[in-house]
Amino acid sequence: GYASGDSVAFFEGGEGIEPWKRMQRAAIRTPLKVEHLLASSALPFIFPAKKINREYFGDGSMRQLAPMSPAVHLGAERIFVVGVGRMNEHDVRRRGDIYPSLAQVAGHALASIFLDQLMIDIEQLQRVNDILGRVPPSVMEHLGLPLRQIETLVISPSERLDDIAARHVDALPIGVRTLLGGIGGTKRAGGGLASYLLFEKPYTRALIDLGYRDAMTRADDIVTFLGLKTVAAVP
């Protein structure tokens, strides 16, 4: 919320699930409506904030320090994460000899807001799982620690989304292109910023195609994780 500064998770669930409150994040039980969806997708400076009860809310990724926390609090035993970050690039470093443009800096800042926390949270969950796997359940029960292992499957793009965005900058309205061009946003290094502004069909179609290919590459993992018998390929 813009007034409180808290990351609020609105949820529906069984009566046994109690709302929670942590540092800078909280949960509120309420019937989910269209305004909650609009608020959760209200990108700053692009889509208008939505007022829910006493304050205005923006994109759900802002100040979301623990993105998987709501699923954990709601009792999830398995979490299927479809990310848009760079989980596959731990050992890949790009050379940068050219001073970063304003667009590149802005894209970097936006990534720190919308992408990085999810990857950090995934690593944290995996570390907790590893620790719990080394501690006998009887010890955890004796200590009274309400911790449990949570199975995760993480799928992330095999191609950088900012590279794809850089190839489709021409699909943006001319006014937006002109603005981006003045700060280096129409060059490859500015693709990160462009990816947050692109909602045109050529770009979204490319994302859908990439997502389909990556999902089919991991089809066996997905089938096993979801407990399915098989997955049908769509031409």
Q: Model-flagged regions — what are they?
A:
Residues G1-P235:
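Patatin-like phospholipase
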